[in-house]
A protein has these predicted regions:
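Long, charged low-complexity interaction segments
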Residues: 196-215
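Basic, nucleic-acid-interacting segments
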Residues: 1-196, 213
Length: 215
């Protein structure tokens, strides 16, 4: 909980907060793009363990989102935890997006975008949904909190379902899994075994050998 990942932006370095990371079990996936009016269920991944990273709402553009995802992918691949292939489903990203007027302090109503199978599709979906929400607000309409499916071929999105609140997900504990207590000593032991991350190694080389950023 309460971690973060540093990215490079046009304005310099920026830290994107990570609210939490938790483990889930894949239930399968819906395939929408092969038929125009039919969705099918693919259970090939059913039961596969996955890790969900819940990010803080710190990103302000499609470029920042892509920079964040690329940094996450680099770290995960470097650690050997996953090959992070979006087209094969070993890395996935759902995008929650809202707009607000300049100077406003409260976030607007957010929507969640799904069916994003590449970084380019994610960037296009963000730009498309941003424009859609701005257009609704300028027309005096309200943005509905909902989950939308991105169609990259049509470069547009479609409403899938109204967005549920937390209680609608019906969370319940798994009775066959015993609680695991993670001690500070165990965490320290794991951290001691971690390899030096690529970015940390790069910074160390730059300092030790006086290598400029250009090189």
């Amino acid at each position: 909980r309460n971690g973060g990942v540093e990215i490079e932006t046009a304005g310099g370095k920026k830290t994107i907060g990570i609210h939490e990371i938790h483990m889930e079990e894949d239930a399968g996936k819906l395939v929408h793009d092969e038929w125009e009016d039919v969705s099918i269920v693919d259970y090939n991944r059913s039961g596969v363990p996955l890790i969900e990273i819940v990010s803080e709402p710190d990103m302000r553009s499609a470029d920042e989102v892509i920079a964040y995802l690329e940094k996450l992918r680099m770290i995960i691949q470097y650690l050997g935890a996953s090959d992070c292939k979006l087209n094969e489903g070993s890395m996935r990203a759902d995008v929650n997006l809202s707009v607000r007027e300049v100077g406003a302090t409260e976030f607007g109503t957010r929507t969640e975008m799904k069916n994003l199978n590449s970084f380019k599709a994610i960037a296009r979906a963000i730009e498309g949904e941003r424009e859609r929400q701005i257009e609704l607000i300028e027309m005096g309409k309200s943005v509905v909190q909902e989950t939308r499916r991105w169609d990259d071929n049509k470069e547009s999105s479609f409403a899938m379902r109204s967005k549920e609140d937390a209680q609608d997900y019906r969370y319940f504990p798994e009775p066959d899994l015993v609680p695991i207590v993670i001690s500070d000593e165990w965490l320290a032991e794991v951290k001691a075994r971690e390899p030096e991350l690529r970015t940390a190694k790069l910074e160390r080389y730059k300092k030790e050998y006086d290598i400029p950023d250009y090189d």
